[in-house]
Amino acid sequence: MKKYNIETNCIHGGYRAKKGEPQVPAIAQSTTYRYYDGADMADLFDLKEAGFFYSRIGNPTVGIFEDKMASLEGGVAGVAAASGSATIYSTILNICQKGDHIVSSSSIYGGTFNQFKVTLPAQDIEVTFIDQNDSLEELKKAIKPNTKAVFAETLSNPGMEVLDFEKFRLLADFAKSPLIVDNTLASPYLCRPIEHGANIVVNSATKWIDGHATSMGGIMVDGGNFNWEEHKDKYPGLVEPNESYHGLKFYETFGDAAFAVKYRVHILRDLGFTMAPQNAFLNIQGLDTLHLRMERHSENALKIARFLEDHPEVEWVNYPGLKSSKSYEAGQKYMPKGRGGVLTFGVKGGSKRAAQVLGNLELASLVTHVGDIRTSVLHPASTTHRQLSEEDQIKAGVR
């Protein structure tokens, strides 16, 4: 099949209407699907055949969104979920169980930080946070024999640090573990982590993918580039016989897509973090204009960052498109089309003065969100990262 550029794939990737089919994917608002042969149903439940039988596990509209995102990220398969947080949680649980360990950059979204610091340890999954700016040799000290994953964000929220993919790929290789990258703030238009060594990519589709603040959603894309068989002692759930499916072996049966299939028919089946068809439809509409929006968002953010950098009442500005940013060079390397639509800045006078600025806004909206076509503003320390201690806020890039 001919390869198209990413701008074309935003519109056409993952879905081509056949004769008589709708040009715009339809909403399959149904929980279940009719069959006329019991043997056909049995084959679906045994994973011998692909198809839809219950919308907790798969839905035609959601499936189109999954295929489109897999195409955009350059992976072998995608699985959608109800939110970005549900996606990250499910991704970790797909390879981790009681007694396991993961390593994560500390410069991550507050909800993810809390999930890793509070929720996972409550299930006896240990998380070690690292400073992603440390040397590779220093980062290696965090790796343990039971380390199952290395996690980071392409563009950290709200630290605005562009990930050094080369360094983190080497760290994951040292750990003999997959590199999981949250691509939310960049989107697959500005960066494709799999091309830079990531094995699994997650996105909160609620943000730039939807782009209009209308729907919740998350998506995991399996890069299909981690050899689970080579590390079978570490990842038995993907290699050894699965009790739920009468001894089926995911990697042996599904090859490069093993992680995605297990995620769907095991984790999504049991936890039910299912994306609604209506939300999938809205996210599909968002993808049609993703390339145009991300270009303009990046242009606008850079203009605002430059304006604020010269403003006498502004203490500092953090945006990887500025030459003053410590991530400027990494941004040029990994995000050449633009640095995204989010920036952070500090006003002189501290939090009290910041509150006054927020109260004086007219056009920009004070909301708990990024990724909207409308300009949004937020004070992370008192909102998205409020549950973190002051020390953890600093680690996460909140000033």
Protein language model regions, located:
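Conserved C-terminal alpha-helix-loop-beta "cap" of PLP-dependent enzymes
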Residues: M294, L302, E313-R399
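Conserved PLP-enzyme active-site core in the AAT-like
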Residues: E7-R16, G78-D310
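Short amphipathic alpha-helical segments
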Residues: A50, V76, N279, N283, ...
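Conserved N-terminal alpha-helix of the aminotransferase class I/II PLP-enzyme fold
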Residues: D37-A86, G111-T119
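Acidic-histidine catalytic/liganding microenvironments
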Residues: L72, L308-P312, L361
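Short, acidic Gly/Pro/Ser/Thr-rich loop/turn segments
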Residues: K18, R34-G38, N227-W228, L290, ...
